Design a protein with these regions (language model features):
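A short C-terminal boundary segment appended to hydrolase-like catalytic domains
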Residues: 268-285
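Extreme N-terminal starter segment of soluble prokaryotic enzymes
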Residues: 1-4
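Short beta-strand scaffold segments in enzyme catalytic cores
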Residues: 89-90, 109-112, 151-153, 240-242, ...
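Cys-nucleophile CN-hydrolase/nitrilase-fold catalytic domain and related Cys-dependent amidase chemistry
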Residues: 14, 22-116, 124, 198-212, ...
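Residue-level detector of high-confidence beta-strand sites
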Residues: 109, 122-125, 193, 252, ...
């Protein structure tokens, strides 16, 4: 199955970001990608963290997202349908259930659309990033509410295989137990992890962690990322990539800026690796 990781440098202009995302998804589809993943915060990298609150949407109907209050979900569904791809739509801010009486925070949510444009999965980011090096401080919990439920789904590819896909977002990458739990029912074939790693943490840990999660789970990892200097002054690490089950980086965008990272992932190769080193069968704890 050919997969694509989209790299962006999103801005405070939601319309421009969405149009960039649509153009890059179209480029990936034209190159033969069956599954396309957008980066975290693809629709908005605001000047302030609270900018997310202004564009937050309620969760739309899975089959009919075309409502005035859900424009982002509408365009995502239409993009998946137009190009006939599985679209793992980075993250968008979704409103917290009004019953929780929390209007100051939103969920940072990954929505997944099938090639007909139907929403088939939702994952709310569980682990919220906090960073303080004495000079810079960032705390996602100020505007985000943590999700509670790990999410995996089955994605059938055109060659007849069914891929077990586990979802994570950015900081989730640092918590291997999440992906172990996702693989309890059935081993994961692919982890998809939209991200907006800071350049500081990215230089130190991004590739290391992606390769570690691939090796631990003997699966592929698809990691679309924000990559570059944003108008808010934040620099994200980029290096969107695909990692194979042996821990080898199979494809990568090594430069800043927007782009499409394409890779053919091979289930037969993954099966061979698992036979060669059946670590998943050797677990004791």
């Amino acid at each position: 199955m050919k997969v694509a990781a989209i790299q962006m440098v999103s801005t405070p202009d939601v319309h421009a970001n969405v149009e960039t995302a649509r153009r890059l998804v179209a480029q990936a589809a034209q190159a033969g990608a069956e599954l396309v993943a957008l980066p975290e915060y693809f629709c908005l990298m605001g000047l302030a963290d609270t900018d997310k609150l202004a564009i937050a949407e309620p969760l739309a109907d899975a089959d009919w997202p075309a409502t005035p209050s859900t424009p982002l979900q509408h365009v995502l569904a239409e993009t998946a349908r137009e190009h006939g791809v599985w679209l793992i739509a980075g993250t968008i801010p979704l409103r917290v259930d009004s019953a929780l009486d929390d209007h100051s925070r939103v969920f940072n949510s990954t929505l997944v659309y099938d090639p007909t444009g139907r929403r088939v999965a939702r994952y709310d980011k569980i682990h919220l990033f906090r960073f303080d090096d004495g000079q810079r401080r960032y705390d996602e919990a100020a505007v985000l509410r943590a999700g509670q439920q790990p999410v995996a789904l089955d994605v059938p590819s055109r060659d007849g295989h069914t891929w077990r896909v586990g979802l994570g977002v950015c900081y989730d990458l640092r918590f291997p137990e999440l992906f172990r739990q996702l693989g309890q029912e059935r081993p994961l074939d692919l982890i998809v992890l939209p991200a907006a790693f800071t350049d500081t943490t990215g230089q130190a840990h991004w590739e290391l962690l992606l390769r570690a999660r691939a090796v631990e789970n003997l699966c592929h990892v698809l990691a679309p990322a924000q990559g570059g200097l944003h108008p808010n002054g934040r620099r994200t690490h980029g290096h969107s990539m695909v990692v194979g089950p042996w821990g080898k980086v199979l494809a990568e965008q090594a430069t800043e800026g927007e782009g499409v990272v394409l890779c053919e992932i091979d289930q037969a190769r993954q099966t061979a690796v698992r036979h060669q080193l059946p670590a998943l069968q050797h677990r004791v704890l």
